């Protein structure tokens, strides 16, 4: 199971195109008393919690939710998104001493000199979807429109052509 989570319902089709088997919009999860509704929902639908979570948002509240939705004993939460400068993340120590792991990732953990050439070769052979993530292109003169596409959730990635 791969569960994609986004507040923009338009992202569901893209998520499923890239391999998600389920989609959860946090806005559709009813509030609960005395806890985080998303954590409780995810733990309930996965029979105890997720094996792996990946936060790409940079939102410190989502980072904590991703950790706390992990399964006790073996769940691993990886932070990929970058938080605003000066922000700090926190959780109760109980979340970690019960076996969950919280880690960060830069560049997917790839070692540039030794591993990147092989990844590029696999991309060139068609093993990885990369081009499909670019849903919009704008010339430099329309950079503001490109940013609007991103902020309004109309695209996955917008490339700004400098030429």
Task: Describe each PLM feature range.
Residues 58, 81-82:
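Short glycine-/small-residue-rich Rossmann-like dinucleotide-binding loops
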Residues 76-78, 90-132:
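Rossmann-fold dehydrogenase core element
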Residues 48, 64-68, 113-163:
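C-terminal hydrophobic helical "lid"/dimerization subdomain
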